[in-house]
Amino acid sequence: MLFQNDETMEFLKALIRIGEVSSVDASKATARVVFDDFDSVVSYDLQVICRNTFANRDYAMPDIGEDVICLFLPTGTEAGFILGSVYAGDVTPPENTVNRRCVEFLDGAKFMYDRSAHALTITIGDTAITVNQDAVAVESKNTIQAKVG
């Protein structure tokens, strides 16, 4: 074991925790997390780490029930951050290759970029739009409208 000192190990366990989101405050970009390994204690509002928050802004909140990794300040469990989500249990990633970046939504909508094929595909229901360096392809069981100029 890397840490032989029990006190140090307990300190680290208090700083870094894995829990499940129990509520979300979308307007403040915060969430509360329940920690089953700490007698189901619920955290205070924790800030959700975002990629950008100034000139470029990114926004994505975890869902209630989502497993997350949290980091707390050394001053206690009143202030901390949700660093991100982790796949656990029956929940699996929407892709299984390092060449694709994918965002899949609950309703099945999907944004996927394949860097090996240099192609971006957006799928919503039965409609798929694929853009690469040579063409734009639209497939749909419904009406397709295009406007130039």
Enumerate the predicted regions with their spans.
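Beta-strand/loop nucleic-acid-binding surfaces
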Residues: 42-59
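Short solvent-exposed strand/turn elements
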Residues: 33-44, 101, 105-107
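Right-handed beta-helix
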Residues: 2-5, 59, 63-67, 73-149
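Helix-turn-helix-like N-terminal two-helix hairpins of bacterial/phage DNA-binding regulators
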Residues: 19, 36, 50-51
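Conserved hydrophobic positions within beta-strands
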Residues: 21-23, 82
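Short aromatic-glycine-enriched beta-strand elements
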Residues: 27-33
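Short boundary/loop segments of OB/S1/cold-shock single-stranded nucleic-acid-binding domains
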Residues: 1-17
